[in-house]
Amino acid sequence: MVMVVNPLTAGLDDEQREAVLAPRGPVCVLAGAGTGKTRTITHRIAHLVGAGHVATGQVLAVTFTQRAAAEMRSRLRALGAAVQAVSDFGVVRVLTFHAAAHRQLRYFWPRVIGDTGWQLLDSKFATVARAASSVRLHAGTDDVCDLAGEIEWAKASLIGPEEYVAAVAAIGRDTPLDAAQIASVYAAYEALKARGNGVPGVTLLDFDDLLLHTAAAIENDAAVAEEFRDRYRCFVVDEYQDVTPLQQRVLSAWLGDRDDLTVVGDANQTIYSFTGASPCFLLDFPRRFPDATVVRLERDYRSTPQVVSLANQVIAAAHGRVADSKFQLSGQREPGPAASFHEYSDEPAEAAAVAASIARLIEFGTSPSEIAVLYRVNAQSEAYEEALTEVGIAYQVRGGEGFFNRQEIKQALLALQRSAERSSQTEPNSPLSDVVRGVLEPLGLTAEKPVGSRARDRWEALTALAELADDEVAQHPRLDLPGLLAELRLRADARHPPVVQGVTLASLHAVKGLEWDAVFLVGLADGTLPISRALAHGAESEPVEEERRLLYVGITRARVYLALSWALSRTPGGRQSRKPSRFLNDIAPQMGQNPASSRSRRNRTATLRCRICKNDLTTPAAVMLQRCQICAADVDEELLLQLKAWRLSTAKEQNVPAYVVLTDNTLIAIAELLPADEAALIAVPGMSVRKIEQYGSDVLQLVRCRAVAVRTQT
């Protein structure tokens, strides 16, 4: 007897197959990280179409990002070709919520509204600024950004201007400005849009309005509802744990009294509550649809058992309602290395060590594009941009800008430049660090961290810049403001990484759905993860639990190699008062033991000392040179010039930034140590086996020719 294999279920595990073959009707797929959710839902769509349950044009699948939508469309096309389907699965409509609403509103608007036109606001900034001005609220750029964000949250949460004050009070929400002021701006903003911002016969809509008007059109016009529901019979929603009340309203309008809905999600990956996202719709799905098929996917095909085990331990300690849906993932890959934990004296030491570890991974064959450094807040990227630049490793900042490309840093450098030009008016005895902070204070470097998210991002970036200045002053005690600016601009100019094939630097919020062979989770100190504003709500509060889920998301991005680290102080020589993240208490070796064990960890990561003056090395550059940058060294300046000329020529030939060939500090070390052979060259900081294979013969030839020239001259 010949068994007939269904090509749409071949290769699926038992749980995936159950989800794919579930009958039409409500289906809830609870899919843990790395369990193949996209594979499962695309195969389910293909099964429903291929079995004749629904036509391709009657399926609407919605995602949260264009990238996810494109991936799903691509998989559906490939699946149709692979099984030689009569129907082209690739024509299934796969859109984001906003894109779907945009299409529907353009079609139904004339019937519902009439001749009044509408325009979509690409950005609400200018209109929010006008609204603030109209209610006599003086709002700077950061305030306007925070107001816009708060309006987005309110609309996503189905909270109007008149309910805003009571709503935020009821849930204890931290607001960037006085709640009554925000409500006034919100109301003025809606009024301005309704009047077309002064354009006759036009209504302005923001992206949330697309959803609001689409839902209202279907809810209030029976003909519109009938036409839409006749067109779309089957719905699939990805990442359902991230649905907002507004998006759920649209989905409910689409469905009407039908139940042909498949949702996929993981409440343990709910990390976007600041946008209005709520896992309650996923958690309540079986209650709303008592006959629903519920399938749990717990076989993790992404990560090694070691990574999976760590993720399970982190989420096992969760509290609250979301914790009731926690998974016990089972790693399906071959075993790999155990996750490592590292404690460092300060943040520069942590960054330098991470960069060195990344260099070793690359040396042993890991592609830079398969490595990521993940952190809680964007301002943390600066130390890693600096450290990777020092060792000549290209990087890209995902979901944000490089440190020196951020608008607030450009503004700060311009303000410092203007202050330097007026230096004659500056108190001659003022410490340079105080001068810098005095210049940065009006730009947002306040004594207390602001509440608003945009203002807080600015504050964190300016704080990082001020501490960079402190580092430079520590290395160069006689530095003045023009000299400091020159040093900072040198750092900025050195950072022009390629955008491909580089190490990824990203915040934890920017990496959902992504994965790498090697992941470094950095800055894991209490107050950073969980962040201090979450701790203010209580140790077992929902904001703290969301921070735990952020760590869980970070861990589950790693396929094979995972390192977790933290620093005891922010700056070299600072008071080592930080504690490791409380989320590590039950998972990191030696955590929670006696003080002696804690001291032994610190000793293993003690700060390196200068080989000349024996003082602590406080910057990645100093660590690279194995000496303070101000300590006198016997550098052959002529050789250094020749090395830089060779590097420039080589970089042009390879079409890469010069630092990717060899960094300035590596060239300085070569001109100082004068290595005579490969054995001596490998001892030079920054010279790996790979670098020697690529450039060793050229470098040694330059050193030898220079030695001959020196002997001839003498």
From Swiss-Prot:
Keywords: ATP-binding, DNA damage, DNA repair, DNA-binding, Helicase, Hydrolase, Isomerase, Nucleotide-binding. Residues 572-602 are annotated as: Disordered. The keyword DNA-binding applies. GO terms for cellular component: cytosol; DNA helicase complex. ATP binds at G34, T35, G36, K37, T38, R39, R302. InterPro entries: DExx_box_DNA_helicase_dom_sf (IPR013986), DNA_helicase_UvrD-like_C (IPR014017), DNA_helicase_UvrD/REP (IPR000212), HRDC-like_sf (IPR010997), HRDC_dom (IPR002121), HRDC_dom_sf (IPR044876), P-loop_NTPase (IPR027417), UvrD-like_ATP-bd (IPR014016). Residues 633-713 form the HRDC domain. Belongs to the helicase family. UvrD subfamily. DNA-dependent ATPase, stimulated equally by ss- and dsDNA. Has both ATPase and helicase activities. This is ATP-dependent DNA helicase UvrD2. The gene is uvrD2.
